[in-house]
């Protein structure tokens, strides 16, 4: 949703007459983009979660395909979430081959399921890559691709005066529990335990949870229940960037946010937690 909104914003500035239809979240909604349904309705964490909701996901895929064909766009622009977007793109292409398909954020074929590349070229006309090393995987299968870089690297992190934002008399530690509700429910308790341990050793820290607007209340409620005082929860993107740049280190969920932390030159600890079934499945599939 965030990546798509940045692309759409630039397109709107160049051509305000383009019409859009999406499966998006709050960022696209803020740009006035109509959504078939909210992105949260297809956001599931782990293999087992997807398996338990497979019929709901299939229904959403079919609804999305139906609405795309009805909308009859010139371009189907899909972003990340390959297990959803690739299925949609594949079926749309079969129904109407005139619709050009562009996918942004290539599937991580260098990590697992490398053979996906052979299938992708049947329905994706152009792949936009975040990382330069990805090119060889798609060049090998003659899939048209362009290295466009990662938008997070474009964002400059500027150290600034944080007065009135958080407790600036303490050392700042940024915490990133993820954007999915399922991730937050698992990782926030772990991060709160981490804070308790850190406070026993040294209370001279200010811990800041980086949240989305949608998930802020959930994190705030967890923080209140913990009764830990030296914690702030922020959702404003401009403030988050400033606080991250002023942090002594960060603890973050594995994923895109780890690149953001790295680009800010902030040392980090990467965390994640899978249940045992998801762990064993992923261990079997990884390259």
Enumerate the language-model features and the residues they cover.
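A donor-sugar binding/catalytic signature common to diverse glycosyltransferases
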Residues: 27, 236-285
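Donor-nucleotide binding loops and adjacent catalytic segments primarily
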Residues: 25-27, 182-246
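Charged active-site motifs of nucleotide-sugar-dependent glycosyltransferases
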Residues: 168-174, 205-206
